[in-house]
């Protein structure tokens, strides 16, 4: 696909914090739009991977608006929890994505697996997939991760 300059870009999220973070990383000459401008609800994320869920969002929002859309899916994988919460990370925070609630659940689940987990370094990683789509066509999709531990 030939490279073309992007003048307008839709950020495929209803999370205002995420929108602000992504916007701060992009060139100032790109006209940024949010899903809230179009009163769009998020699609059902029924993919099995971060990449699949990212693509579901970018294609959905692009088709709804006719704009090129950048969307992400990200989460925490914890080895002791069989890579959970994984693609369900946001759901661990409850209906409103409460970070403190999600962390409490992580600690609770770790304690169920190993009561002494706090004395150990539990391998974990943050995974993020980003995709750009135009209508129903994927332009690009990448994924990366940052390895670390919970202690």
Residue map of PLM features:
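Anionic-ligand binding patches
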Residues: 2-10, 16-151
